[in-house]
Amino acid sequence: METNEKSRVLDMTRGNPFRLVLKFALPLFFGNLLQQFYNLADTAIAGHVLGDHALAQIGAVSALYGLITNFAFGMNNGLALSLSRSFGAGDEQKMKHVSCWMVTISMSVSIVLMSIFLLCKEPLLILLQVPEETMAGAMEYLTIILIGIPFTMAYNMEAAMLQAVGNSMTPLLFLLFSSVLNISLDYAFMAPLAMGIGGAAFATVLSQGVSAFLAFILIWRNYPLLHFKGKDYQVEKKFVLEMVVAGFSMALMSAIYNIGSVILQGSINALGNLYITAQVGARRLAELFHTPGLALGTSVATYTSQNMGGGNRNRIKKGVWSAFFLFAVWWIFSMVFVTFFVEDAVRLVTGSSNADVIYNTALYLRISFPLIPTMAVIIILRNMLQGMNHLMMPLVGSSLELIGKVIFAIWVVPAYGYFAVCLCEPVTWVVCCIFVLICAFLCRKELR
């Protein structure tokens, strides 16, 4: 294992796979955990200061916001796969080419996304069946979030660049700063300044913008391998096309999953504010316990890409098994939590004293948590396949998740209510887990 102390890069082509995956995943885990704690704090502040109605306003558009952020995350992680392979191969000139086009593609897409969503926001909220009494606040919150899309994309791009060269610690430090700033601004905007639900959105956009700016300064000062000039645009069209395909493949994979969540959110909105509030609390807590799977998935993607680039394919299976073991340990802790402490956590996060809200939030978690390991298998193997440059298989897997959520949203939830919402993800996880396991089995010979 070789690290450069100045830039914190991590060469994952040499050394113990378990230690490498763990070392890279830990900062990602704490970063994701920090992000989820921020989301919990954001929800708790809104719930305690503004009440259940504010939670319903945020919850009504939370799936749409998740679609945007996960598209940005997927796009930049896909673009960064080329950077990881170039780093693993020691090709410094190619790294500059990748950085150049990564910035161009990412920021261009952010402007297009912002424009499209701003033009379509009102029809989208109508399609989501947002209740009339919630519409005005949801519209205000969403508008501010959409204006901040370029900041969201920029920060995700810079974090992906750093992670591609093995540095998962610096993005954690920026996320720590962003979260502390965000929580402070949340309270200031919603309580003393009485900016209402718009204050929560503005705090998010402002903190992401500041973090993106500071990350840019750090990369410019300390990472000459990521610097580029005008001449670095001069590459073969095939090179750019490969980056675009990888970026949009991972973005679409994330987007397809989240489109299903948006459609499902529409069916939840139709159930009324009580279930919207229960769902936002349930998702905040569920996502907190999903964080190790996401961190390990990103670690496996970087580990796989670097070892593919370095010609060390036989090391990849060891890294994947290490990731499975680490998640199994976390799952045991998760089951202890959901068995003994879930109701208290719901009260803390939502600030709600409504017995029906607490019951339905806890029900969602108790049904989904036993099957979280299937979600981890999906994420880890999907990232392994992407690191091996198999882009269609994960995309098909995400499409299966979309189909499952559409079926539940259109037919099952209207018939069986919120109980069907609780069953939706576990059922789709099992189906997609089987598919991804088959894909990994078919690709096993490439790892010899």
For each feature predicted by the language model, list its residue ranges.
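Short alpha-helical transmembrane segments in multi-pass integral membrane proteins
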Residues: 1-25, 83-148, 192-248, 304-371, ...
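N-terminal transmembrane alpha-helices
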Residues: 12-49, 63-78, 82, 107-114, ...
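Transmembrane helical elements of multi-pass membrane transporters/channels
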Residues: 23-42, 144, 178, 207-211, ...
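Transmembrane alpha-helix boundary and packing residues in multipass membrane permease domains
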Residues: 28, 32, 44, 81, ...
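Helix-terminus/linker motif at the lipid-water interface of multi-pass membrane proteins
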Residues: 37-56, 125-132, 188-195, 255-288, ...
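Small-residue-rich hydrophobic transmembrane alpha-helices
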Residues: 55-115, 152-171, 265, 279-342, ...
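Hydrophobic transmembrane alpha-helices of multi-pass small-molecule transporters
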Residues: 67-70, 182-186, 212-216, 288-291, ...
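Short runs within selected transmembrane alpha-helices of multi-pass transporters and secretion channels
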Residues: 76, 145-163, 171-179, 200-213, ...
